[in-house]
Amino acid sequence: KEEPLTTHADHFNTNYAYSVASYSKGEVFLAQLGYIVGQKTLDNILLDYYNQWRFKHPNANDFIRIAEKRSGMALQWYKEYWVYSTKTIDYGIGDINDAGGKAAVTLSRIGLMPMPLDVQVTYKDGTSEMYYIPVNMMYGNKQPENNLPFIIKSEWKWVNPDYTLQISRGVADIKQIEIDPSQRMADVNRVNN
């Protein structure tokens, strides 16, 4: 069973929980931060962090401060959820309805950890669009990471388990909808993405 990263090394209940906390979750933290802020921004965060703190003794807040400054986003919420809790990330696509010639897609937060979402919509004509839904705790948006049209939607308030995504075209035009096509978000059940 997973335990919070803040558990002292000598106090983990199992070696497995210690291994996950000590090795895997740190790697996933950085990869997923790239999903939140964008990979180019993450690369710059890591360079800034190295340049400012090499041969010194930083703490976790020093890293988050640099990440917030470089990204222009509030990221303390991300650190708090990832380090101090064992809440999981799980998002799913629910109903897809036609609303006046435009598709209305119900997205659900099944897990208890909120995250911003990249939702790629592929149409039957072969074109695609990337819809970006920030979390209201971020106070900012990432920049587009590919050449797809990048549409920033209204923020998803973390207290709401569901969100209705309005898509610019009708249901009949849609071939596929996918949450996190880059697969950098640590979603525990990608089947419903």
Predicted segment positions?
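Hydrophobic alpha-helical and helix-loop surface patches within well-folded domains
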Residues: 1-106, 110, 114
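Compositionally biased, low-hydrophobicity segments enriched in charged and small polar residues
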Residues: 46-53, 164-167, 188
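Beta-strand-rich binding/interaction modules
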Residues: 89, 95-163, 168-181
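Short acidic/polar inter-strand loop motif in beta-rich domains
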Residues: 181-192
